[in-house]
A protein has these predicted regions:
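Carbohydrate-binding/catalytic loop surfaces
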Residues: 75-86, 135, 139-142
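...with weaker cross-activation on analogous glycine-rich loops/strands in unrelated enzymes
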Residues: 81-95, 114-128, 150-153
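A beta-strand-loop signature enriched in Asp, Gly, Thr, and Trp
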Residues: 70-79, 101-126
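Non-transmembrane alpha-helical segments in soluble domains
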Residues: 13, 17, 40-44, 55-56, ...
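Catalytic-site signature segments of enzymes, centered on catalytic residues
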Residues: 1-82
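Active-site Gly/Thr loop motif
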Residues: 119-167
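Active-site-proximal alpha-helical segments within enzyme catalytic domains
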Residues: 35-42, 80-103, 162-168
Length: 168
């Protein structure tokens, strides 16, 4: 699909700009790696730092994540759509931080309002994804019956079946 073409494009951002939208934003769920790539570039532009450098300072260091690698595109930008390698224990740290409302060791790492916005349902997915009811900012949600209670379960899903589940 387009992700393979993105990886081969001499100018990945220009390639993304040239792909027409299949639907209006927010109107239908259609996961697309191109949007994730552009989100990474937006972070770079907003922060003034490479995506991996920003993540290292703002997220990985506060979580104690010291071993990771992130693949780069031909323009030498970290691939916002994936290729981030973390140890299982480090993905668990991200999940625990989300469970703890963005706080790690008593220190706020992610703003509460941003985390709530990321987890909020933005588009329904149930018609095309039986494992999720909705998708937010890179997080899925599914209401599960757990012990007779309806509980919202949140999860991030990566290539190759990698997942982070957060069950409040």
């Amino acid at each position: 699909g387009n992700e393979d073409k993105l990886d081969e494009a001499p100018d990945p951002a220009a390639f993304v700009r040239g792909v027409p939208a299949a639907t209006a934003p927010g109107s239908a769920y259609r996961y697309n790696s191109l949007g994730s790539y552009i989100a990474g570039r937006v972070v770079e532009n907003a922060s003034g730092a490479r995506l991996d450098d920003f993540a290292a300072k703002a997220l990985f260091a506060p979580l104690g994540i010291t071993r990771w690698s992130w693949g780069r595109d031909v323009a030498n930008h970290p691939k916002g759509q994936g290729n981030l390698s973390l140890r299982a224990r480090d993905t668990a740290k991200i999940g625990q931080m989300v469970l703890d409302d963005g706080v790690v060791d008593g220190k706020r790492v992610i703003d509460t309002s941003w985390l709530q916005a990321a987890l909020a349902p933005r588009v329904a997915t149930g018609a095309v994804d039986r494992y999720a009811d909705s998708y937010g900012y890179f997080w899925y949600a599914k209401t599960q019956d757990i012990g007779g209670q309806q509980i919202a379960v949140y999860f991030a899903s990566g290539n190759g079946g990698n997942k982070i589940y957060v069950i409040p």
